Every structure is written in structure tokens, then in C-alpha cells.
Amino acid sequence: IRKFCEMKIIKAKKITKKNFSKFGQLIDTSKKNPININDGYAKRFDNLINLDASKNKGKAIVSIFKAKKRRFPMKIDMMEKHPLGSQAFIPMDDTKFLVFVAPRGNKPNINKIQSFVVPKQTGINYNAGIWHFPLISMKNMNFLIVDRKGKGNNLVIYKFKKDKIILKK
């Protein structure tokens, strides 16, 4: 019996708090009530994500990623997950980007993969264990990353061997 590979073309759709909720949280200030601080010269938006870094005595770290512009349509040949902690991507540039995700599991379920366009001035936080493709930038851009560092294997990579997945923006 010969198993045929499946070809799937995925088009990115607009992200919303609701359609992204099973993968993580949006990081924005549009629907939050800020706290006035610094004698009214600043507004503080608290508790924007569910940061998860403490498994196996891990700690939260902040990094900067410099991402290169991707070409579309693009082939998706792998996905990764971080089982021991969440991972937040906060753009430092006024540019939208794409995310490519699948629910938790032993491997990505090709029938449940989704892609979203993340608007300007919005970040995302992946829950621990969510399958995702590395950064997909529409332009060269910088990201502030809040991630986990510590003991244990916090990176699992899955390579698609037979299935062919194409992402269109």
C-alpha cells in the first residue's frame, strides 16, 4: 500500500482574540484599562499575557530577534514547540507579521493548522506546547522576545516528511 502525501495550501486570516485563544494571547492595548503612572505622564497596561516559564526551575528572559523578510508563497517544512514555557513575540517595528500554528499534541495535526496576520503594534504569546513555525516577517523587523531559559528540553522540532504545506499571505 502506497501512502500519498497530502498537499495543503493555507492562507493567513485576520487574527482576533477569540480565534487565537486556543494557541495563546494577543498582546495589545486596545481593550485594556490602563493605570495612570508617573504623575499622569505614562499609562501602564498590566497583565497582558500568561507568562509561563517556571517549569523545571526555568526563568523568564528577554531577547531581541532580528528577523528577515520572508518570500511568499512559502513552503512550511517544519514546526516547533516549547513544552516547558510560553513564548512572546512583541514587534519593535510598526509592521504586521504572520503566525503559523497548530494545537498541542505529539506532532502537528495538518488538518488543524492555521495561519494568522498579526496587525501592526500587536504581539502574540504562544502557550507552552503550541506548535508553530519560526518568525514569519513581512519585512525585515525586530522583535522583543519573552521566553524561558532553564533545565530541560524546551525545543521540540517536527519535520514534515510527506505532507507539503504552502503558506500564502
Give the label of every model feature segment:
Residues 1-6:
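Short, Lys/Arg-enriched N-terminal segments with co-localized hydrophobic residues
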Residues 7-115, 147-160, 166-169:
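Non-catalytic, conserved peripheral segments adjacent to functional cores
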Residues 85, 122, 139:
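Residues that flank catalytic or metal-binding motifs in active/ligand-binding sites
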Residues 117-131:
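Conserved metal-binding segment of the jelly-roll/cupin
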Residues 120, 135, 162-164:
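Generic alpha-helical secondary structure signal
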Residues 122-125, 165-169:
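Short, surface-exposed linear segments at secondary-structure transitions and domain or protein termini
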Residues 130-157:
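A short beta-strand-loop micro-motif that forms or neighbors metal/cofactor-
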